[in-house]
């Protein structure tokens, strides 16, 4: 738990550091945006020379030079400014592209870290799940083993109880059997005793009858003797004695029969009672044995059912635990998968958002550079047109003044005009040659700038392609925008290029009669004491600057 908190704190610190770095870079970019581009213009002053003619010539030469500067120099300045703006826009675009690539790389690194963290978490959860599953499996096996042991114990206990019940039943049956035998023996002994007693009673009755018969016989003899003594009484006593003897005999026989019947009846009753008791004890013993057997079977069934119930409960508990761990494993796997997908989605959204921000930033910078370039080009164009107009007016005024002076002093300046015209022609040719040379240099410089920009754009495109492949193609748009902005800055808008290419300066002096300028220059030189060789007519005194059109290739 502590390691997870430390890891979370480290992630928060890294995220805060990245946010501070991004805020600092944004602040620097805003400061650079507020600074803008400063353009310094230098003005050159032309010092005048001695003399009116020299001043006029220098004025004319200055006018021609300024006209050349309008055609060549201002275009060069505009090209320099455009190139500086292009370089600035290119540098800013490249910086924006580098920043965007760096941010994309950081976002990629963060996404990779998030992915690694998520995979680590998934591995931990997977290991934890596997560990829990293994523990559940071991626990289930342990439960099964315990259940098996319990079942064995219950089985042994059931067998023991069954054995004990069987032994108890056999013991009870033996006891009941012994009890029945004992009771039968006791009944037999009782019957024998009763029979002996009855026999004894019969003997006693028999002895009693014999005794009574003897007594009666004695009494009869006595009576007979008495009767014999009494003559009259002899017959009566004899009858009486016979009668009494018969009565005693009948009574004895009756008593003997009664005792015999009683003894037989008692013997039969005792025998019946003994048999009935034996039968009852036998049935009781069988009933007890059956009850003991039923109780034993019931106990065995109960223990068997209890063992089966315990085994089923243990199995159900094991299955439930296994199912719970399985559900827990599936839930953890689903949560880990959802967390992984969420982290990947957040990293992807962050990367796309950062790429969009850097793309917008690069596009904004390119647009600002383009606007600055267009504005500078427009200002240069307006300045060039204004300068051309001023120079044209100034040249026309100077030409008019010169013509006026020349017309007033025709004879004085006639000889000097040829030399001055020749010098002006040579100066014009030199200026034209220098202008052409400058145009060629500018053309070569523009081609070099184009080639350099093309190489830079190609290298940046390759770098952007590599970085864009690593960032899943999201940087191509930003680098493409920067590239388009750079190309736009290099090539400039078509209307601006057309205006730049088609700028021309034509200084036209009012036509005069042939020799008028030469005469005026000669007269002026003679007036100031300067001599020169007359070279003749110079033709039409008209200065025309050729228009140079160049084509710029597209990158």
UniProtKB/Swiss-Prot annotation:
This is Embryonic protein DC-8. The keyword Ribosomal protein does not apply. One of its GO terms (cellular component) is extracellular region. Signal peptide: none annotated. It comes from the Eukaryota. May play a role in late embryogeny. It holds the Pfam family LEA_4. Belongs to the LEA type 4 family. Residues 97-391 are annotated as: 17 X approximate tandem repeats. Residues 83-118, 132-151, 184-204, 444-472 are annotated as: Disordered. InterPro entries: ECP63-like_dom (IPR004238). GO terms for biological process: cold acclimation. It is found in: Cytoplasm; Secreted, Cell wall.
């Amino acid at each position: 738990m502590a390691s997870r908190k430390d890891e979370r704190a480290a992630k928060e610190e890294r995220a805060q550091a990245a946010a501070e770095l991004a805020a600092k870079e944004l602040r620097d970019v805003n400061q650079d945006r507020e600074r803008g581009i400063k353009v310094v213009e230098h003005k050159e002053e032309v010092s005048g020379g001695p003399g009116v003619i020299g001043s006029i010539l220098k004025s004319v030469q200055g006018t021609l030079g300024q006209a050349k500067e309008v055609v060549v120099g201002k275009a060069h300045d505009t090209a320099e400014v455009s190139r500086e703006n292009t370089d600035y826009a290119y540098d800013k675009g490249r910086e924006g592209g580098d920043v965007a690539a760096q941010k994309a790389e950081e976002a990629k690194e963060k996404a990779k870290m998030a992915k690694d963290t998520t995979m680590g978490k998934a591995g931990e959860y997977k290991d934890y799940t596997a560990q829990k599953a293994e523990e559940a499996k071991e626990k289930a096996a342990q439960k099964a083993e315990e259940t098996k042991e319990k079942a064995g114990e219950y089985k042994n206990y059931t067998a023991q109880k069954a054995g004990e019940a069987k032994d108890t039943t056999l013991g009870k049956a033996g006891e009941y059997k012994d009890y029945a035998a004992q009771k039968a023996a006791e009944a037999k002994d009782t019957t024998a005793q009763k029979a002996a007693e009855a026999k004894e009673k019969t003997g006693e009755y028999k002895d009693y009858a014999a005794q009574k018969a003897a007594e009666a016989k004695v009494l009869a003899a006595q009576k007979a003797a008495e009767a014999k003594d009494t003559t009259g009484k002899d017959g009566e006593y004899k009858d009486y004695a016979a009668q009494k003897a018969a009565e005693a005999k009948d009574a004895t026989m009756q008593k003997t029969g009664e005792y015999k019947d009683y003894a037989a009846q008692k013997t039969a009753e005792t025998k019946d009672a003994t048999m009935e008791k034996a039968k009852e004890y036998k049935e009781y013993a069988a009933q007890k044995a059956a009850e003991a057997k039923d109780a034993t079977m019931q106990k065995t069934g109960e223990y068997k059912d209890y063992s089966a119930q315990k085994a089923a409960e243990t199995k159900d508990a094991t299955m439930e635990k296994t199912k719970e761990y399985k559900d827990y494993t599936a839930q953890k796997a689903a949560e880990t998968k959802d967390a992984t997908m969420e982290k990947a989605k957040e990293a992807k959204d962050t990367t796309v958002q950062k790429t969009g921000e850097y793309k917008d930033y690069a596009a904004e910078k390119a647009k600002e550079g383009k606007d600055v370039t267009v504005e500078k080009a427009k200002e240069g164009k307006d300045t060039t047109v204004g300068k051309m107009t001023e120079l044209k007016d100034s040249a026309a005024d100077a030409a008019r003044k010169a013509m006026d002076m020349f017309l007033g002093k025709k004879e004085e300046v006639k000889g000097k005009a040829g030399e001055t015209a020749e010098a002006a022609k040579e100066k014009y040719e030199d200026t034209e040659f220098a202008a052409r040379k400058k145009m060629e240099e500018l053309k070569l410089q523009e081609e070099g700038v184009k080639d350099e920009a093309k190489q830079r754009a190609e290298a940046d495109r390759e770098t952007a392609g590599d970085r864009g492949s690593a960032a899943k193609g999201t940087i191509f748009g930003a680098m493409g925008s920067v590239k388009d902005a750079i190309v736009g800055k290099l090539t400039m808008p078509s209307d601006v290029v057309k205006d730049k290419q088609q700028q021309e300066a034509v200084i036209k002096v009012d036509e005069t009669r042939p020799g008028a300028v030469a005469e005026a220059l000669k007269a002026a030189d003679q007036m100031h004491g300067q001599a020169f060789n007359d070279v003749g007519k110079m033709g039409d005194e008209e200065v025309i600057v050729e228009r140079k059109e160049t084509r710029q290739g597209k990158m």
